[in-house]
Amino acid sequence: MNNDIVAGKWKQLTGKAKAAWGELTDDELTRTEGNAERLAGLIQERYGKTKEQAQREVREFFDRNP
């Protein structure tokens, strides 16, 4: 996953991300700027997942939403 491409499309994907991870606020999602590592960190923190679980969820999310 190319973080630059993700960042460029992030505004289009924030609604889908909010649907996937409803406990994250719009502001938090905006602040990640589509950065996969930041997003995974938020998911890890908010949902109590391991780093690997959060990274896998983020990777799968971006694979489903190219």
Swiss-Prot record:
SUPFAM superfamilies registered for this protein in UniProt: Hypothetical protein YjbJ
Top-level taxon of origin: Bacteria
InterPro entries on file: CsbD, UPF0337_stress_rsp, YjbJ, YjbJ_sf
Family matches, as Pfam families: CsbD (PF05532)
Similarity field: Belongs to the UPF0337 (CsbD) family.
Name of protein: UPF0337 protein BP1738
Source lineage: Bacteria, Pseudomonadati, Pseudomonadota, Betaproteobacteria, Burkholderiales
